Amino acid sequence: MATKKYHFETLQLHVGQEQPDPTTDARAVPIYQTTSYVFRNSQHAADRFGLRDAGNIYGRLTNPTQGVFEDRVAALEGGVAGLAVASGAAAVTYALQNILSQGDHIVAADNLYGGSFNLITHTLATQGITNTIVNVNNLEALEAAIQPNTKVVYAETFGNPNSDVTDIEAIAEVAHRHNIPLIVDNTFGTPYLIRPIEHGADIVVHSATKFIGGHGTSLGGVIVDGGTFDWKANADKFPTLAKPDPSYHGAIFADVAGKAAFVTRIRAVILRDTGAAISPFNAFILLQGLETLSLRVERHVENALKVVDYLSKHPKVPKVNHPSLPGHPDHALYQKYFPNGGGSIFTIEIKGGEKEAWKFIDSLEIFSLLANVADVKSLVIHPYTTTHSQMTPEELAQQHITPSTVRLSIGIEHIDDIIDDLAQALDKI
């Protein structure tokens, strides 16, 4: 499909399997439920292991079902290559571990998903990797946070849980001026609404569990290589990609894989050694979700904007944190980066405190109380006591998470039913 520029809705259905399955003529992508692959002869096996011949070696590294999924997400994001792994957390961890090691430093946004925040501030810190957490939209603070040993700037298109909007272009300009790549988590944005690589991001990560899968059935993560960062021009800073790798007889991934060096090294080294592989079945299920991504996201956004309008006028909801509102500090960025709308995951403040927030949540009937977002079903949770509960009071305040904060993930049910459910729950507090 490379000879013609197709629209998103077409790409999400066809990339990676432009022709029927060559063995069975099946139109649907088969589930290749196998652990390993037969080599034609000993030379063929040696060439595969030596990276001289691209192809399947072992199920921990590659799988044909997985390969279609990777190619499709990469195409939708405008990247050169993709790598699917077992979860979104694995995708974030591997992307950072690929260039960070003891003695290095990361600058990260202060509005991250709680799991990513803990990974950066606690887990990576135990490995000798220091961090500075800042409002990355404050470019002066971002500049001040960058140190000689800073290897990456990390942010999300929409912050979690408040859906703050990241100024990707401005942040990328600062990072690149310091010869540092920008990694962006586009889970909440989705490639249907925004493609961070087009705005200057170098690497994009996803929890495919969320919008890509869309139905709350399968875990998965994806890393997309934009192919835009020149690792060899910064070889001393990024030796894992631009200098000989001793575990591959001195191969240099920037030479062996070219623009796809970033994800190739993760697959060949980190995934090989640590094994957070996605199963063929999960890759298949996530492909089914991907094929309807545009349709679902349109409905998510349409419903969310109507809910925002309703709640912003309700006397028991003193605050709605959504960038579509003219009074939101990121409203101008929202208009710039999301001309077709976005942000079906956001927070509200319930009048009162934790008691009232819990009463509201427990009174909802359509909304499910669970630790996920971006499902076709509407979801709700209390971040202060769940998803962000490991944070200190200072960290919670920095992210504007209070005992009265409630996170909503608006699904694709009929909008009247969603609003009626919110109304009856608010009536009970």
Regions found by a protein language model. Give the residues of each.
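Short hydrophobic/aromatic beta-strand micro-patches
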Residues: V224, T347-E349, S409-G411
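Conserved N-terminal alpha-helix of the aminotransferase class I/II PLP-enzyme fold
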Residues: N41-A90, G115-T123
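Well-ordered beta-strand positions enriched in small/hydrophobic/aromatic, beta-favoring residues
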Residues: V153, G221-I223, V320, F346, ...
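N-terminal "arm"/small-domain region of PLP-dependent enzymes with the aminotransferase-like
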Residues: A2-N63, D71-R72
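PLP-dependent enzyme catalytic core of the Aspartate aminotransferase-like
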Residues: A2, T121-H122, T130, P148, ...
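Active-site beta-loop-alpha junctions enriched in small/polar residues
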Residues: F158, T187-G189, L325, K351, ...
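Conserved PLP-enzyme active-site core in the AAT-like
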Residues: A2-T3, P20, L83-H314
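Conserved small-domain helix->loop->beta segment predominantly found in fold-type I
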Residues: T274-A277, F281-A283, Q288-T292, V297-R299, ...
